[in-house]
Amino acid sequence: MMQANLLPLVIHPEVKAALESRHAVVALESNVITHGLNYPANVETALAVEAAVRRSGAVPATIGICDGEILVGMHREQIERFATTPGIAKVSSNNLPFVLAQKSMGATTVASSLMLAELAGIGFFASAGIGGVHRGGEDSMDISSDLIQFTRTNVTVVCAGAKNILDIGRTLEFLETQCVPVVTYQTDDFPAFYCRSSGYRSPQRLDSLEAIAQAIDINRALPGSAAMVVAAPTKPEDAIDSRDVQAAIQAAIENAAAKGVTGSQVTKFIMKAVEQATHGRSAMANAAVLVNTAEIAGQLAMVYHRPR
């Protein structure tokens, strides 16, 4: 029999009060604080993302693992600790039990954040971009655990599509195969992170948050349903031309192969190359995408929690 203290949830008082009153709450990952941006930009962005959720009327809940405890919502001091502590583990669904057992610190990805959000009773999650099938994934089988986790939780994911470095066509095919409902907000194109279009059409378009909220309600009532992925493109003024990004990515892939860069290092290599090719615009766009998706997630959660 499982002991209750095996999963020590520490829920921030603001988040706890919101959940108890059935108010809208949006979960956020902590991986962007530890692995996405440098200090102090990581703290500034984390606080800006939380502020964006609050602007919508919802309550933010940044999730992370701290000394073996599951934090659901963080104080400023905890965000600072995540931002400045070196060597914090990147935690996905597969290594989450080990990080908890070792009572260490861990920054949650999309997959683990969804698992812990559901554990806490949170129904919405915001991320800049989901993981997916990597380029060459048909041979390497390098597929993000995000896609599998969508089938195991029913927490709605609001994002700006999938990350640019992925094989987005195969990612969409994989989501369809796994019965994951995908909808785009006010666009026919499936977005790609800080690019407003990935070059692939959306499986489904809806133009109002009310319509999306109704679809979420129905999806959650269906037996065996997966999480719904809601993709909202970044604002035009924050977007980067997809042609520039794709050219930089292709050049980086060829350069990585020539230098013998393999495994998880390839992603870091490509992202750094894109940042250099865009003269730092990609890093700024990354932060803007995070803020925009967080605000839309908050708005959607507020609409969902309205009496209908």
From Swiss-Prot:
Q: What is its EC number?
A: 4.2.1.70
| Pfam families registered for this protein in UniProt | Indigoidine_A
Traced from the root, the source organism's taxonomic lineage reads: Bacteria, Pseudomonadati, Pseudomonadota, Gammaproteobacteria, Enterobacterales
Gene Ontology MF term list: hydrolase activity, acting on glycosyl bonds; metal ion binding; pseudouridylate synthase activity
Q: Give the superkingdom in one word.
A: Bacteria
Q: Which InterPro entries match?
A: Indigdn_synthA-like, PsuG
Active-site residues per Swiss-Prot or TrEMBL entry: E29 (proton donor), K163 (nucleophile)
Protein residues bound to substrate:
K90, V110, S144, S145, D146
Give GO cellular component annotations, separated by semicolons.
cytoplasm
Q: What GO biological process terms does the UniProt entry carry, in alphabetical order?
A: nucleobase catabolic process
| Cofactor: how and how many bound | Binds 1 Mn(2+) ion per subunit.
Q: What does this protein do?
A: Catalyzes the reversible cleavage of pseudouridine 5'-phosphate (PsiMP) to ribose 5-phosphate and uracil. Functions biologically in the cleavage direction, as part of a pseudouridine degradation pathway.
> By its UniProt entry, which SUPFAM superfamilies does this protein fall under?
Indigoidine synthase A-like (SSF110581)
Q: Which cofactor does it need?
A: Mn(2+)
Please list the disulfide bridges. Answer: none
Residues holding Mn(2+): D142
Enzyme class (EC, first level)? lyase
UniProt keywords (A-Z) are:
Glycosidase, Hydrolase, Lyase, Manganese, Metal-binding
Q: How does it assemble?
A: Homotrimer.
Q: Which family does it belong to?
A: Belongs to the pseudouridine-5'-phosphate glycosidase family.
Name recorded for this polypeptide: Pseudouridine-5'-phosphate glycosidase
Query: Keyword S-adenosyl-L-methionine: yes or no?
Result: no
- What does it catalyze? D-ribose 5-phosphate + uracil = psi-UMP + H2O
